[in-house]
């Protein structure tokens, strides 16, 4: 910000991996890491699939859009320890090619398809693979929602509803006790 201060009775921290740094400023450490996921779009292809595609090994996932292009996502192999600032990090032929090889291994018909664009971003992942949607008892008025491991877009409507219920002191529409932050507390 421009140095301005804002106050509220309730604060929601939902900043992906950066949530870890924000909550650390008030003594809360959410054990999580990040990894860089990439996506690509091919030129239009003849119709092949009406379903979402993916592999058990998570080599890639994606679908064919109605107009014919394929949209795929895959891990880049870049992890949190990658020695690059977020401003420097870009998708490139070295990382995108690994995803392309995985896709062609399953769908050889796409071997000659041209890639028209790529993009990527960091995904946040709690160490147990389960997101945190929780009030933080140690900091009254603090609610955290993070660690969605790339599933944020799919779950956002339900998570938004539950966060609004939490802010208003209501019971959530589903039991989210398994998503509480305190599961990371030491039992000693």
Language model features: what each stretch is:
Residues 3-4, 68:
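Detector for glycine-centered tight turns/loop "hinges" at secondary-structure junctions
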Residues 101-188:
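C-terminal catalytic lobe of FAD-dependent flavoproteins
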Residues 22-24, 82, 154-155:
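Short glycine-/acidic-enriched loop or helix-start segments at secondary-structure transitions
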């Amino acid at each position: 910000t421009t140095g301005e201060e804002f106050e509220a009775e309730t604060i929601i921290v939902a900043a992906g991996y950066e949530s870890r740094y924000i909550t650390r400023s008030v003594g809360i450490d959410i054990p999580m890491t990040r990894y860089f996921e990439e996506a690509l779009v091919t030129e239009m292809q003849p119709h092949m699939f009406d379903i979402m595609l993916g592999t058990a090994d998570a080599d890639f996932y994606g679908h064919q859009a109605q107009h014919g292009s394929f949209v795929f996502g895959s891990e880049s192999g870049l992890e949190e320890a990658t020695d690059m600032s977020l401003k420097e990090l870009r998708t490139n032929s070295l990382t995108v090619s690994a995803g392309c090889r995985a896709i062609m291994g399953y769908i050889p018909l796409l071997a000659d398809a041209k890639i028209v664009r790529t993009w990527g971003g960091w995904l946040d992942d709690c160490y147990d693979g389960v997101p945190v949607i929780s009030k933080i008892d140690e900091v009254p008025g603090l609610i955290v929602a993070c660690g969605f491991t790339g599933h944020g877009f799919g779950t956002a409507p339900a998570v938004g509803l539950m966060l609004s219920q939490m802010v208003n002191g209501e019971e959530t529409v589903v039991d989210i006790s398994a998503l509480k932050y305190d599961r990371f507390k030491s039992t000693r």
